[in-house]
A protein has these predicted regions:
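The feature captures the beta-strand-to-loop junction immediately N-terminal to the Walker
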Residues: 51-53
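Conserved ABC transporter NBD signature motif
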Residues: 74-86, 122
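A short, flexible loop at the N-terminus of ABC-type nucleotide-binding domains that lies
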Residues: 11-15, 24-37
Length: 276
C-alpha cells in the first residue's frame, strides 16, 4: 500500500512557480496580511487543490496565479514567464458562472473564443471551436438556450466550456461546484476528471470539500489559518488514474489521504475563531 506522503514543493517540476509570495491588503483598520512566504511549484498536467478554513487566502492565492491581483512581495511564473496580469493561457472558472443572461450558451462561449482566436482564424473555425467546447462538456443540445433556461449544473458546465475553449495552459477553478447540490456536484466532478484526462490540463482548484480534493487531485496544498496564512503541508495523492468514486470509497490509500487532510484542518488548524 502506498501511504500518502508529505511532499516538498521545491522538488516538483516547475511549470507554475510561486516564489516567496506575500499579499497584504489595505483596510479601514490598517494593513491586513493575507498571505506570507508562499512557495510552491506545480508540474505541467498536474491537478492541485488548495484547501483550508475560510479566510485562509485560498481565493487570494488563486487570484494571484490568475494575474487578477499583484503580490505585495515575491514572484509568480507560468512556463518561465512572470505573471503580470490576466492572460488567455490561464482561464478562470468561478463559483458564480458569470454568464451573460441575454446571450445563448453558444454565444457566451463564442465571446471567449473570438477574443483569443478572432484575429488569426476564420469565422467557420471560430464556430467549430465553440461547438467543440460545448460538446466536450456534453451541452451541444443546449447550445441555443439562454442561462435562465438551464439548470445550475448546466450553467457551470457552460462556464467550464468557456474556459476550455481558450485552450488555456492552466485552468483555475474557485470552488466551481460549491453552490450545487450533492448529486449534481458529484456528476460534475466525474465529468471534470474525464475532461482533464482528455485535455491534459494543468488545474489549480480552490475547495472546502476534503473528499473532492482527494478524488480529483495529484497534490493537496493545505493552508494555515489566516491572517498571514502560509502553506502548512502539501500532500501527494498516490491514487492511480482513471479514478472511480465508488471503487475509492473503500480504498485504503484514499482513506489515509482523507484522514491526513482532516487531521490538518480540524486537529492542527481547528481553532478558526482564534485565528480570525
Amino acid at each position: 500500500m502506498n501511504h500518502p506522503t508529505l511532499h516538498n514543493p521545491s522538488l516538483s517540476t516547475k511549470f507554475i512557480q510561486i516564489q516567496g509570495v506575500e499579499q497584504t491588503f489595505t483596510t479601514t483598520k490598517g494593513l491586513f496580511p493575507a498571505l506570507r512566504d508562499i512557495n510552491l511549484n506545480i508540474a505541467r498536467g498536474e491537478f492541485v487543490s488548495l484547501i483550508g478554513h475560510s479566510g485562509c487566502g485560498k481565493s487570494t492565492l488563486l487570484n494571484l496565479i490568475a494575474g487578477l491581483t499583484t503580490p505585495t512581495a515575491g514572484n509568480l511564473l507560468c512556463a518561465n514567464k512572470e505573471i503580470k496580469g490576466p492572460g488567455p493561457e490561464r482561464a478562470v472558472v468561478f463559483q458564480n458562472h458569470s454568464l451573460l443572461p441575454w446571450l445563448t450558451c453558444h454565444a457566451n462561449v463564442h465571446l471567449a473564443v473570438e477574443r483569443v482566436f478572432g484575429k488569426q482564424e476564420t469565422k467557420a473555425q471560430l464556430q467549430a471551436r465553440t461547438a467543440a467546447a460545448l460538446e466536450l462538456v456534453g451541452l451541444s443540445h443546449a447550445a441555443h438556450k439562454r442561462p435562465g433556461e438551464i439548470s445550475g449544473g448546466m450553467k457551470q458546465r457552460v462556464g467550464i466550456a468557456r474556459a476550455l475553449s481558450m485552450e488555456p495552459q492552466v485552468l483555475l477553478m474557485d470552488e466551481p461546484f460549491g453552490a450545487l447540490d450533492a448529486l449534481t456536484r458529484a456528476k460534475l466532478q466525474d465529468e471534470l476528471l474525464d475532461i482533464v484526462a482528455r485535455t491534459r490540463s494543468t488545474v489549480v482548484m480552490v475547495t472546502h470539500d476534503v473528499d473532492e480534493a482527494v478524488l480529483l487531485s495529484d497534490q493537496i496544498v493545505m493552508l494555515t489559518n489566516g491572517p498571514a496564512a502560509t502553506i502548512g503541508e502539501v500532500l501527494k495523492v498516490p491514487l492511480a488514474r482513471p479514478r472511480n468514486r465508488v471503487a475509492l470509497a473503500e480504498d485504503r490509500d484514499y482513506q489515509h489521504c482523507r484522514k491526513a487532510v482532516i487531521d490538518f484542518l480540524y486537529t492542527r488548524q481547528g481553532h478558526v475563531e482564534k485565528a480570525a
